[in-house]
């Protein structure tokens, strides 16, 4: 019996000892894990400190511009500080890229060309490129079938199939002017073209180009066209072109003269790029009668496309496009709504849908009925009477 008790005690002691050692092992594992994390953090801190020390000890480099190559090994470079040097080139740098006007990095001590830099881009031009035109299909533009066809022939066809023009022996249009009353879809058309073509899109608000310093506005125009040439295919869309494209006159303030200099630079750039090149220009305005004749001549803006107020059929198409995403209940008589909306443009028709939705929300409904649309069109018809159409000359371009 005593042997059995001894065996039980030894077993209990062994189990207790095992548990203690297991707990001790887990504790050691936890300590090792913590130590590894601390080591990892210390290594990270060490590497960061080492990088900081290197950056403090490193010598800056000079930015220069290649004027012209002398031979296979040496080039004439103008440093940013002003003086000119004859310098060599690092073996890893591609010498074919070092053409006149290329920005380069020069070593502080030896003035050797270390690497080539991309062209300097004005932040204003850079921001133009990064404006998203949105995902707009041609089917979202209602009532403008002929205008879409003409615009695609002028802009999309030369970019996608330039060989068609070469085969026929004609020169494609360089640029297109979209003109018409406000709210008829000029900007929407340009955005639809941009989202359906795999090309860079520069959206320019003409009034934003004007700068108070003499020559800055013209420099922006030059940089914009240079950037477009380097990033072909590219579409430049200049909205509200009447801000800089108005008729020139002899008298005026210094601000007027700056606008005229900007226009002359724009005309010069329009003459400068190749017609078969992959840079196309779209301009939009609702004041075509004030534009300078030099801007409108063929060879600069070859096609003038009028975007008129929609007729009854076009209004029906536009209204159905805007109403397609609205939760509706019952039959909607679009024909009656369109008849009441005589003289409405595309923006007004979109506003009808918004106002109809507001009437539904006011009635605590989550759907729109026909009566909401009728109330909305009557309300907007009253507001429409306050608008004036005197700013748009409907006779422009008609003989």
From Swiss-Prot:
Subcellular location field: Cytoplasm; Nucleus
Listed PROSITE patterns: AAA
Keyword Oxidoreductase: no
Residues the record lists as binding ATP: 180-187
SUPFAM superfamilies: P-loop containing nucleoside triphosphate hydrolases (SSF52540)
UniProt-recorded Gene Ontology molecular function terms: ATP binding; ATP hydrolysis activity
Residue location of crosslink Glycyl lysine isopeptide (Lys-Gly) (interchain with G-Cter in ubiquitin): 203
Family annotation (Pfam families): AAA, AAA_lid_3, Prot_ATP_ID_OB_C
Gene Ontology cellular component list: cytoplasm; nucleolus; nucleus; plant-type cell wall; plasmodesma; proteasome complex
Record keywords: ATP-binding, Cytoplasm, Isopeptide bond, Nucleotide-binding, Nucleus, Proteasome, Ubl conjugation
UniProt keyword Kinase, yes or no: no
Domain of life: Eukaryota
Membership in a protein family: Belongs to the AAA ATPase family.
Cited function: The 26S proteasome is involved in the ATP-dependent degradation of ubiquitinated proteins. The regulatory (or ATPase) complex confers ATP dependency and substrate specificity to the 26S complex.
PANTHER family: 26S PROTEASOME REGULATORY SUBUNIT
Assembly, per entry: Component of the 19S regulatory particle (RP/PA700) base subcomplex of the 26S proteasome. The 26S proteasome is composed of a core protease (CP), known as the 20S proteasome, capped at one or both ends by the 19S regulatory particle (RP/PA700). The RP/PA700 complex is composed of at least 17 different subunits in two subcomplexes, the base and the lid, which form the portions proximal and distal to the 20S proteolytic core, respectively.
Identification of the protein by name: 26S proteasome regulatory subunit S10B homolog B
